[in-house]
Amino acid sequence: MTLGGLTITAQAIELANKMSDQFVQGAGDGLLGLAFGQINTVTPTPVATPVENMISQDSIPASAELFTAKLGSWRDANEPDKGESFYTFGFIDDATVTASGQEVKYAPVDNSQGFWMFDSTSATVNGTSVAQSGNTAIADTGTTLALVSDDTCKAIYDAIPGSTYDQANQGYTFPSNTTADQLPVVTFAVGDTQFAVQKEDLGFADAGNGMVYGGIQSRGSMTFDILGDTFLKGIYAVSPLAHVDDGLANIV
């Protein structure tokens, strides 16, 4: 398997027996998992993940056993990179960090469940804190939305004029003519640092009848938040394997 300029030998690839209509209609033709190997479901013998193989095959240096993710956005369509996304394996893109005007901030990660899980004990909406004692979250590029507690969802959409819970779409919506200055500043804690969701990512898709389906929705019965692409589009994520930290720098 080849990823950019890296070749991974003897990489196991699972074949799907059934695919959703949404997946079939998408532009991609596969899913690259970047979680930890302990959630591997291959039977009878688990296999190494792509990143584990990169490390064991010395495709990335021992001094930089990490990967990074920068998810592009439509807001950058007029930029030189056209808003394209990228991953790096084995190095941090210093130009992206420099452009953010910030240093990478690291938070301890609990990988006991196989996820990039960290403490996320608060959120803010227009500067007002929403306490989430004992709360944890995972960063997941494979999840489109940000999925958070009901209390946090309510605080966010209470701050957007005309927002409502749409029973038909099973989620919060708000008027499509909502201007940027009417949208709240929303941040989520990653360890001790708050990171903002870009306002243009608060809306996900057209919900009809002049409404937009929100990019942040309820996590339902899950006991942790999933900070997916809605959140990740606003940051540059650095994920070291060796010391199990998760590093984030705001993108501006």
Which role does the model predict for each range below?
Residues 128, 132-159:
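Active-site beta-strand/loop microenvironment that shapes enzyme catalytic pockets
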Residues 3, 124-126, 141, 190, ...:
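Structural motif
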Residues 20, 37-39, 92-94, 143-144, ...:
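Conserved beta-strand elements of beta-rich interaction domains across eukaryotes
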Residues 82-134, 204:
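Flexible, small-/acidic-enriched active-site or ligand-binding loops
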Residues 31-32, 137-141, 147, 226-227, ...:
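Short hydrophobic beta-strand that contains or immediately precedes a catalytic carboxylate
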Residues 18, 180-252:
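Aspartic protease catalytic domain
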Residues 1-100, 155-189, 210-225:
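Non-catalytic N-lobe/flap surface of aspartyl protease domains
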